[in-house]
């Protein structure tokens, strides 16, 4: 494992992912989420940040086993969409929607699914580009 790339990609994941989540949930779509009444009145920002630390450590670690080092952008995009968009999104959207009361389940499903897909694509591409092509590929 290339420790420098791992740490850099993880740090980038944490910072970029947290910024996307913060802006998405607490700025751009704040009124939508407020109207859904699915979140606590005061979000606990520290828990969100800790979540991104854990996600980043795992996402980047597992990415190293997935990548082939030939097409970093494409490999990162696919990995991000599958791991973040589908797997994490499945839990974050479907399971949360099933467990919590909301004023509009369809709005929740659309907005939160879009968040996971877009975030997964951005983070996957970014990590793929940080790792880049493998030598000789």
Predicted segments, located by residue:
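Juxtamembrane/disordered regions of integral membrane proteins
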Residues: 1-137
């Amino acid at each position: 494992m290339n420790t420098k790339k791992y740490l850099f990609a993880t740090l980038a994941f944490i910072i970029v992912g947290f910024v996307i989540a913060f802006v998405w949930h607490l700025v751009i779509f704040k009124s939508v989420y407020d109207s859904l009444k699915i979140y606590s009145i005061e979000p606990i920002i520290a828990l969100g940040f800790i979540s991104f630390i854990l996600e980043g450590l795992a996402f980047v670690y597992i990415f190293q086993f997935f990548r082939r080092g030939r097409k970093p952008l494409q490999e990162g995009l696919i990995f991000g969409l599958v791991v973040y968009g589908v797997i994490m999104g499945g839990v974050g959207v479907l399971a949360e929607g099933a467990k919590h009361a909301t004023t509009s389940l369809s709005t929740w499903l659309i907005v939160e699914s879009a968040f996971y897909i877009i975030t997964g694509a951005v983070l996957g591409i970014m990590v793929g580009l940080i790792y880049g092509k493998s030598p000789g590929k």
